[in-house]
């Protein structure tokens, strides 16, 4: 009534936006976002170590999460921590919808203007084999050598697979993909018990003694681990503390120093 136009149409089955309602919707969303930001800012000013922290993580980042999560929970017992493991594309979409506070993943192949990425570490795309596999003792492996192996691969859409596909599509080689899976720790388990070879980031094998990572001999073979936040969004006190703990933890420091 205050606006002088009808924003919603109701019938016995549903409520839908009118044309003025569609036009007004972006402003309404911005108002809600601004109100939520103000609430977070006031809470942080009062140093209230309470609330919820929503973190999006891709599967490859699992090795660096455990120590940070346990330390954070001990230090901030009143903050509820929600960790979401998904594909990078899905997590970045969640970030844009403000459903997560930040995302930990590798840098996407194509930058998104609404998202700010800060580097954590660098690693390489690698062939993952059992420790007693014939390739395990090599310092590097070529695509031609991989084409001669039975492969157990991460599914299309996962970052390591996307990175590999970019190089594979430029070659004239055929790769014998015997198995695809979107659960990285199960891939590592299968590879460690067989002669299958997988392709993942070298950092993925951290903490898995039954497998080794052999860098793939490729131009510009570098994967950049990043913290992704929404451009211009307010960063919670809890998020700053979590990321500070993450940067200080030993597993991440080993990754940084290994490159």
Residue spans for each PLM region:
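Secondary-structure junction motif
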Residues: 106, 136, 149-171, 235-243, ...
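Flexible hinge/capping segments at coil-to-helix
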Residues: 46, 114-151
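A short LG(V/I)-centered, amphipathic sequence patch enriched
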Residues: 1-19
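A late-sequence structural motif
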Residues: 64, 213-256
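Beta-alpha-beta core module
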Residues: 112-118, 122-124, 138, 185-234
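Short beta-strand-centered segments that line the small-molecule binding cleft or hinge
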Residues: 26, 67-71, 89-125, 129, ...
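N-terminal winged-helix
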Residues: 40, 46-76, 80-84, 89-92, ...
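Hydrophobic hinge/microswitch elements
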Residues: 87-100, 106, 159-214
């Amino acid at each position: 009534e205050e606006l002088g136009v009808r924003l919603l149409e109701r019938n016995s089955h549903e409520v839908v936006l009118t044309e003025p309602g569609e036009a007004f919707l972006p402003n309404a969303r911005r108002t809600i976002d601004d109100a939520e930001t103000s609430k977070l800012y006031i809470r942080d000013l009062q140093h209230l170590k309470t609330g919820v922290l929503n973190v999006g993580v891709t599967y490859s980042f699992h090795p660096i999460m455990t120590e940070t999560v346990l330390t954070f929970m001990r230090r901030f017992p009143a903050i509820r921590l929600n960790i979401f493991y998904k594909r990078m594309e899905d997590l970045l979409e969640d970030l844009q919808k403000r459903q997560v506070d930040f995302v930990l993943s590798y840098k996407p192949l194509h930058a998104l203007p609404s998202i700010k990425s800060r580097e954590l570490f660098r690693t390489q795309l690698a062939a993952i084999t059992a420790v007693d596999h014939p390739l395990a003792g090599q310092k590097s492996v070529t695509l031609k050598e991989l084409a001669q192996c039975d492969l157990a691969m991460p599914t299309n859409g996962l970052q390591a697979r996307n990175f590999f596909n970019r190089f594979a599509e430029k070659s004239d080689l055929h790769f014998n993909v015997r198995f695809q899976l979107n659960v990285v720790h199960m891939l590592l388990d299968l590879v460690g018990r067989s002669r299958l070879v997988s392709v993942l980031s070298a950092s993925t094998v951290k903490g898995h003694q039954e497998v080794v990572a052999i860098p793939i001999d490729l131009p510009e073979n570098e994967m950049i681990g990043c913290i992704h936040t929404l451009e211009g969004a307010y960063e919670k006190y809890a998020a700053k503390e979590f990321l500070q703990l993450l940067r200080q933890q030993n597993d991440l420091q080993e990754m940084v120093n290994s490159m």
